[in-house]
Amino acid sequence: MGSSGSYLKSGGFTSQEWEQVGEIKSVKILRKIGLKKDATGNLPLYGNTPGTAYILLKPNGRFHQFRQYGEDRKAKFDIDYGRHNSAKPYLHMHTYSGKDRPEPMPITNAKGDIINKSLYEKYKGFLKGIKL
């Protein structure tokens, strides 16, 4: 795995800042090398393989982020579980278009009610430790 700051346009990375620590449904779970104990951060903005996806878990093993990459290896969208402008965490999606990361599209609300059933059903197999 690489890093977002050392991506080569020809593909791949100049240094490794991420390591694979497992898989869920054939999608690699990554952990940033050297990250402080309780820190999570976000997945790299570029993937090593066109069209791949990665998963990031919290230090306690609970789901934090799923990131899908396009054929150009750039981040296409994220599924996140967190407190984006909310007192409580909820499941939401960010779609990348250009350089901006738009406001989230809720998949659940802060109470845990499923709002977007089709997205939830599609990605629920990756939501390790999330109780709705």
Named regions from a protein language model:
Residues 2-132:
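Catalytic toxin/effector domains delivered as secreted proteins or via bacterial secretion systems
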